Amino acid sequence: MIKTIKADLKNKIQKTIKELALSSNIKLDKINIVMQKPPKSEMGDLSILIFEFSKILKLSIPVITQEIIKQIGNEYKTKSMGPYLNIKFNRKEYIQNTIKKVNKEKENYGANNSLQNKKTIIEFSSPNTNKPLHVGHLRNDIIGESLSRILKASGSKVTKINLINDRGTHICKSMLAYKKFGNNITPEIAQKKGDHLIGDFYVKYNEYASQNSEIAENEIQQLLCQWEQGDEKTVQLWTKLNKWAIDGIKETYNTTNITFDKIYLESEIFKIGREVVINGLKEGLCYKREDGAICINIPTEKNNIDNQNFKQKVLLRANGTSIYLTQDLGNIVARKNEFDFDEMIYVVGSEQIHHFKTLFYVADKLGVTNENNLIHLSYGMVNLPEGKMKSREGNIIDADNLIHDLSQSTMLELKKRYENEQNLQKLALNISLGAIHYYLLKTAIHKDILFNKTESLSFTGNSGPYIQYVGARINSILDKYNNLNLANKNTNFDLLVNENEWEIIKIISEFEEYIIKASKDRNPSIIANYSYLLAKNFSTYYQDTKIIDKDNLELTHARIDLAKAVLQTIKNCMHLLNIPYIQKM
């Protein structure tokens, strides 16, 4: 609704400004129309800045304003205030159209075509197979999952990819510790998920290496060499431990409702990049150093086209082995061939900014793809109150343990409310997932997070459980209304004259714009904070207003339709944020 009104107003304003410019023989390259909310609701529903037009057209603000008002006509109420023209909507029509649109489109409300036909790949999670997922992975996962849903809601064809890092020294460290200290233990014997068991041996390796540094390093290199040469026993151990780890990680994905369209294993595709570099050498796009290593020059400044200040980047070592960047080049080629993407987004922590800047430059230079098609969506670190997490020291919040701890805390609270309630465990899990996902999404993704369990689980304030609770409360209101079996042929929306109702309607009507902005900025926190804004406004309205009034059924019907629209919009937000909707709390 609001999008349509803005488009209509922009067309009319543009027409007016063009006519005024033409009459004054002024050439216009572009007409920039600034629309914003007035600081106070009584001033209007939309403000248009006229001042810039006055400077360009050399006309007074009142003259320009009057011409715009003529063009707008009687469709909206208008009032000039200083450099602004304030617009008031036709409330009755606006309310009716908004509520009807939401309750008709239901789960599709908010969907738009701003990214129609755009093919997007999002690579996220990408865990190592030497440890379980921790809360940092959870932030990566929920950013990737939520952004995928937001981009889909804007019309993009999204493919979600997970590249599991199942080779290299990190898994060899767990393998070495298992060989030394494992005694053929299995996840079944240990009664542990496989990823947790492998993580234990990763910690054991670091304990061993701290006392035997040089020996441990030599043993790791020997083990890695044996794997690369295909030594049967080494490959068998590698296969077994990786399967345990990956099976455990997939269990966590299942719990958190994180899904992928395609899962790659690094061990299956890491050689592709070598061909890209060899071809680049043949075409003169990179060069061979005296020691045999193949290199490329990276400008130290983005705009340093002459390459007079550069640093040398090795793409293939002198012994022919590749580095991570070279493997990533191969991955881009494979995905371009398979999906022919328009853009590929990497959801990776901010500590990898330099790596991706280099990767994108090299991909462009070697003709793999235009670097503008590659995006590093970097996010801030997730820290504990006691400091940064270190998996090698065991100082991490495991994802599974965090979910379990929050579920247990929630269970204690739920048992106070529902002594005989069935399925409390499932309810507690869904509340905990809502708490975690919302807490990790509500902050702008580039910022670091200090994870606070208590705050994340709060049933009041800016939290996932609060959003879930408001949704459950509205559902309870609708159940109560339905049980009254009240006949309602035609809703009279003219009765919704409460200022709180008007504010809620305006928030609901802006949902599509929020999705478009979240898509454009690649920022799920926009949707998270929108959902809190809507939930908070409805909660205030509910406290001050009698929604079901048997003495005024006509008003009751109108307010129930409003409540339905609010609930549908909240549910749509929850879907975009991967927060479970709960009917009863």
Swiss-Prot record:
One of its GO terms (molecular function) is ATP binding. Gene3D superfamilies: Arginyl tRNA synthetase N-terminal domain, HUPs, Isoleucyl-tRNA Synthetase, Domain 1. It is found in: Cytoplasm. SUPFAM superfamilies: Anticodon-binding domain of a subclass of class I aminoacyl-tRNA synthetases (SSF47323), Arginyl-tRNA synthetase (ArgRS), N-terminal 'additional' domain (SSF55190), Nucleotidylyl transferase (SSF52374). The keyword Kinase does not apply. Disulfide bonds: none annotated. One of its GO terms (biological process) is arginyl-tRNA aminoacylation. It catalyses: tRNA(Arg) + L-arginine + ATP = L-arginyl-tRNA(Arg) + AMP + diphosphate. GO terms for cellular component: cytoplasm. It holds the Pfam family tRNA-synt_1d. Its EC number is 6.1.1.19. Belongs to the class-I aminoacyl-tRNA synthetase family. This is Arginine--tRNA ligase.
